[in-house]
């Protein structure tokens, strides 16, 4: 019986017709790529706006509930944003701004206080433990900078990647993650 079934299987395999794929125009491929990218970035934008609303609510009314809501909004926003990562490779338009949204790793001490074993200084980064939240003035590039107002412009143009150091991350998902959950105390060993 088994031999008969195997024989029938192989006989029917030969009867299966395989058709060739139809040629596709390059403009159709590009249009499909653009449509998929637009949908992905649209989803990421919508969830980022919801995250902004949740963070604004947390700032206006800092409670355990508003913190939990902001954390959930961050998690919900990360998934669609991560799905856009495929579009950044080889795309200079995306590469130009992506570091302001998704830069990693970050020196957490730039933003806020950290555990004592984090250290207070770094040979590579003078802002390693600057704690911009607690300090109204910072020294960046050898000059004193007013840090009393943490505006979008200050964060994006002065603090983010200050002194040309990529780990000086002041904007984006990972900076928000640090502010919502605090310092990552899980170590730096193998995962």
Positions of PLM-derived features:
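Positively charged n-region of N-terminal signal peptides that target proteins for export
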Residues: 1-4
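Bacterial N-terminal signal peptides
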Residues: 6-14
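Mature extracytoplasmic or organellar-lumen-exposed domains after removal of signal/transit peptides
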Residues: 22-191
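Sec/Tat signal peptide C-region and signal peptidase I cleavage site
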Residues: 15-21
